[in-house]
Design a protein with these regions (language model features):
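Helix-loop-beta segment of a Rossmann-like dinucleotide-binding subdomain
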Residues: 1-6, 12, 110-113, 171, ...
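Helical element adjacent to the flavin cofactor pocket in flavoenzyme catalytic cores
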Residues: 1-45
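Mid-domain beta-loop-alpha active-site segment that forms a flexible
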Residues: 1-7, 53-54, 124-131, 183, ...
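Active-site catalytic microenvironments for nucleophilic, acid-base chemistry
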Residues: 8-12, 61, 193-201
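Central helical "cap/lid" subdomain
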Residues: 27, 33-85, 121
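C-terminal lid/capping helical subdomain adjacent to the catalytic/cofactor pocket in oxidative enzymes
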Residues: 27, 167-221
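General beta-strand recognition
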Residues: 34-36, 106, 174-175
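Active-site lid/adjacent beta-loop-alpha segment flanking the redox-cofactor pocket in flavoenzymes
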Residues: 61-69, 78-172
């Protein structure tokens, strides 16, 4: 999905730089004048910090505190059993999502606060799989080929709301991060709002959303 988006914007003339770790920023007169990466320095009139669970570390490099905590979630991808429901569904009490994807089945869930740790906790994985037979007794654990066991980090904030807006002390820096478990769902409207903020098109009464609730400095002492 992300690769498809990158390919689309490249066709529109956007330069996408991969494998480029940000190492720091140069600031002058309250603005970022250069972003230093492992593939060279980048100068831009506007900078958008939208790096998911890594946003806090980049914010620190820019002198912008962002209280974002990574919350690990897991998924297990199996060969899709015959006769399985066509639609994705949620096992609400167990907080497990079951998603058919072509000839595969993805079962995901849980929330683990373990910092930037990408290791697989197999007890968490077992708990996800063990939840399924309680709802679908025909599902037999161990009788289906596991194609992939995966974990990812969700960027969570103290109040559950993302950060979205300009940084008061760094005038050309916009933050869009901390969307927790619904980053894909909120991605389109977030992109629209970031564009409006940068272009100066957003009026205070534009759509029924108070961006002050998402202010980057709302937890500042």
């Amino acid at each position: 999905f992300v690769r498809s988006l990158a390919g689309h914007v490249e066709r529109l003339g956007v330069k996408v730089l991969t494998q480029a770790e940000v190492k720091g920023f140069t600031k002058e007169n309250g603005r970022i004048t250069a972003t230093h990466t492992t593939r060279g320095d980048i100068a831009a009139g506007e900078v958008v910090l939208t790096a998911g669970s890594w946003s806090a570390a980049l914010g620190e490099l820019a002198g912008v505190p962002l209280p974002i905590q990574p919350a690990k979630g897991y998924s297990v991808t199996l060969r899709r059993p015959s006769g399985w429901p066509e639609m994705p569904f949620m096992l609400s009490e167990s907080r497990v999502a079951v998603t058919p994807m072509g000839d595969t089945l993805r079962i995901g869930g849980t929330l683990e606060l373990a910092g930037m740790d990408h290791s697989i906790n197999h007890r968490r994985v077992s708990a996800i799989l063990n939840a399924v037979p309680r709802y679908l007794p025909s599902f037999e654990i161990g009788s289906h080929e596991i194609l992939e066991t995966w974990c990812g980090l969700r960027p969570c904030t103290p109040d559950g709301l993302p950060f979205l807006g300009r940084v008061p002390d760094v005038r050309n820096l916009v933050v869009a991060a901390g969307h927790a478990m619904i980053g894909v769902s909120l991605g389109p409207v977030t992109g629209m709002l970031v564009r409006q903020i940068i272009a100066g098109e957003r009026a205070e009464n534009d759509i029924d959303l108070d961006l002050d609730l998402l202010a980057v400095d709302r937890f500042a002492a």
